């Protein structure tokens, strides 16, 4: 299934919680014109999109997002994703963000600003194919919950 949302006007949207959650047959999604600068909640936005193999989020403006929990969880076929333009300066919840990404081998989070994150629980749970994960720049001084962060990796 393909969905073209290139004409959606999302400039006033603040909450995208679960927007595509459980879209198991969704393979292609055109989000090229999605305006996300006012969004604060992206929790579970792509949760369970098991047929995704790639998704272009290069136009996503995440500077105001505070919740990215379970964002890509159970996107089992998604092998790679470019998050280099993600601004995570205000994010406080990254719980389960990549949980269940069984096909992914590498995640580059070198640009992630984690100084305000308090919850990283389940973040990389079941990332079974992950061969490289550099978290050397992660600032974890405010994190309160790291339970099950790397379980079944």
Pin down the residues of each PLM region.
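Negatively charged
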Residues: 1-153
């Amino acid at each position: 299934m393909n969905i073209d949302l290139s004409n959606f006007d999302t400039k006033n949207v603040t909450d995208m919680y679960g927007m595509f959650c459980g879209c198991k047959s969704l393979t292609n999604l055109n989000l090229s014109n999605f305006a996300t600068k006012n969004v604060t909640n992206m929790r579970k936005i792509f949760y369970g999109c098991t047929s995704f193999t790639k998704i272009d989020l290069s136009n996503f403006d995440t500077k105001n997002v505070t919740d990215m929990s379970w964002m890509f969880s159970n996107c089992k076929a998604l092998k790679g994703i470019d998050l280099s333009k993600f601004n995570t300066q205000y994010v406080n919840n990254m719980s389960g963000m990549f949980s269940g990404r069984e096909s992914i081998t590498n995640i580059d989070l070198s640009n992630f600003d984690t100084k305000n994150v308090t919850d990283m629980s389940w973040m990389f749970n079941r990332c079974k194919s992950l061969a490289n994960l550099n978290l050397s720049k992660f600032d974890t001084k405010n994190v309160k919950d790291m339970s099950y962060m790397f379980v079944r990796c």
